[in-house]
Every structure is written in structure tokens, then in C-alpha cells.
Amino acid sequence: MSNINHAGKLGKECYTATATCLLCPQHCQLRQGQSGRCHARKNYEGEIESLTYGEVAAWNLDPIEKKPLYHFYPGSSIFSAGGFGCNLSCSFCQNHEISQKHQVGRKVTPAELAEMALEAQKSIGLCFTYSEPSMWFEMIRDTAPLVRAQGGKVVLVSNGTISPRFLEALIPWVDAVNIDIKAFSEAFYQHYCGGKLAWVLDNVEPSGGQGPLGDYNAYHPRGQ
């Protein structure tokens, strides 16, 4: 299975042997063969390649409230899966073993992942979580329609650090989103997360009722 994004939609060539990844606002400028700060993408001959397409780092059947979503099919369970990599580097990350490095995960196709989610006992669908799901953009793009076609629900649990146009590309295939706001402080985001609050807030503007159910979770780690 090829991991290469042949369409080149996630990056652009900006000068000789260097490409800029456009998937998130970090806009990593990568030399040939260099990986981004997310550990999930690299420059392959001037285009941005996904290193984690078809690799599952973790999966489980979780209560929907664990996402946490409290107004979306309360009391139900949802099959949850995630790949490797994250575009933030939160010092308090609970899933740092999969978010801060790329290892070899279980190989699955989008069809296989959709089947796992739909066949899990009492699962209402598939939640992309554990690491940052937007780093798994192509896998979500190819898997979510298969889940929805069988009547399943699709959920994202995200840090909100994704370029708005790529989030908009996923929204038609998503039923609910939880954006985890780490703190309402630019200084906190820069010091503890390696990101910017402004990037997140760009993605939590009201959708005017046209998008999926949104939930926003503010998390402030103790002592920081």
C-alpha cells in the first residue's frame, strides 16, 4: 500500500528540494526526506507524504462520554482509533508514547478499519482520537465515508490545530467534533504546547448549524 499523497494537495514546493506542509498552521518547511514536527509527514521528492496511512497506533471501544461528548448519543459506546503523531508537543500529554514519535502500528485498510468499528459490540461508529486525528487526514478522508455509508457515526477529538480548509474538507463526513482547548492563553500554548491559541480559535467559530455537533473542552493541567 502506498503512503504517498500523489495529488500533492497537502504541500507545495517552495524552493529547490524544500516543500512546505500546508495541513496545519505550523507550515513545516521540509528538506528532501525530512519529517515534520508531527512525525507523521515528510518531504518525498517535493511533495508531502503521509508516513502513517493505514497504521493504527491504538484502538478500543470507549463510552462516548470519554471523548468527552455529553450531548451526542449519551450512554452509547464508540469504536475509537488513532494513528501516530501530533503537531503539538504538550508537556503534559497523556498519550505521548504515540503522539510524539512514529512507530510501526497495525496495518489496516480504510475498509478494514470501518469494518472493525461497525462490528464492535454496540458501537455507534468510529471516533478518531488518542493522537491528533488531522495528522491522519488521508485515512479519515478514505475511511469516514465507508462508516457513514453503513449508518455509523464519525467523531473527531482534535487539538484544533489544523488549517481551516482541511478541516472544512473533513466536515461533510463527520457527525461530531470535540476540540480540546488546552488553555485560554497564548503564552501557555507557546511555552507548554508549541502552538498558538489563535490557530485553535480559528476552528471553533460557530458553524451556523451547517456543520457537525461541536463540543469544546478546556483543559488546564494542574500546577501549570
Residue ranges and their predicted role:
Residues E138, E168, A198-E205, G214:
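Internal, well-ordered alpha-helical scaffold/interface segments
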Residues E186-Y192, V204-Q224:
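Conserved strand-turn element in the central/C-terminal portion of the radical SAM core barrel
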Residues M1-S76:
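Flexible, acidic/Gly-rich N-terminal and inter-domain linker regions that tether
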Residues Q26-Q29, G33, N43, S91, ...:
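Generic secondary-structure signature for well-ordered alpha-helical cores
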Residues K182:
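Cell-envelope and extracellular/periplasmic
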Residues H191-W199:
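Alpha-helix N-cap and loop-to-helix initiation/capping positions
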Residues K42-A176, S185:
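Conserved Radical SAM active-site core
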